[in-house]
Curated annotation (Swiss-Prot):
Keyword rRNA-binding applies: yes
Domain S5 DRBM: 22-85
InterPro entries recorded: Ribosomal_Su5_D2-typ_SF (IPR020568), Ribosomal_uS5 (IPR000851), Ribosomal_uS5_bac-type (IPR005712), Ribosomal_uS5_C (IPR005324), Ribosomal_uS5_N (IPR013810), Ribosomal_uS5_N_CS (IPR018192), Ribsml_uS5_D2-typ_fold_subgr (IPR014721)
Function of the protein: With S4 and S12 plays an important role in translational accuracy. Located at the back of the 30S subunit body where it stabilizes the conformation of the head with respect to the body.
Free-text domain note: The N-terminal domain interacts with the head of the 30S subunit; the C-terminal domain interacts with the body and contacts protein S4. The interaction surface between S4 and S5 is involved in control of translational fidelity.
A molecular function (GO) term: rRNA binding
Pfam families attached to this UniProt entry: Ribosomal_S5, Ribosomal_S5_C
Annotated source species: Gluconacetobacter diazotrophicus (strain ATCC 49037 / DSM 5601 / CCUG 37298 / CIP 103539 / LMG 7603 / PAl5)
Top-rank lineage group of the source organism: Bacteria
Protein's recorded name: Small ribosomal subunit protein uS5
Disulfide bond annotation, renumbered to this chain: none
Amino acid sequence: MAREPREGGRGGRDREREGDDLVDKLVTINRVAKVVKGGRRFAFAALVVVGDQKGRVGYGAGKAREVPEAIRKATDRAKRAMIRVPMKEGRTLHHDVAGHFGAGKVVLRSADAGTGIIAGGPMRAVFESLGINDVVAKSLGTRNPHNMVKATFAALERCASPRTVANRRGKKVSDILGRRDVAGTGEAAADV
């Protein structure tokens, strides 16, 4: 009698299922050297961004003697460190947000439909994996890809939908968005 393979097991909650259609983007690959008694020992470091293009994204770094092994390690780490980002209309951010990591600072702005992804290389990979189609992003400070990606994730973690903000404050979504009736005039308040 043949056994059916079980799902789950040790650490099973961290593993991705087959139907998760993840997109992975290689942000950078770098040759690094470890100096040992007999000379230098070379290895490769990879930075990978993984996302489902529906609001989940993660990044990971991996290092190994061979390039494919470094990419595999980075991809596995990225899959384990995924975050969910709320998106407006499934195409952009709900609000403008800034984030920083080390000397890297990024500013992310929501954009109108048809704007596209206006962002530098490492940030572009994050947005494409995330599934954001319209965003304007600017990187200030460092141009180091690792710090840019980490600063972008710091900014994305600060994003919140109006519903989340309303629940946190104990208010209605209409109060957060400023769509109240002003003294019975029938006009929506713009500056609340």
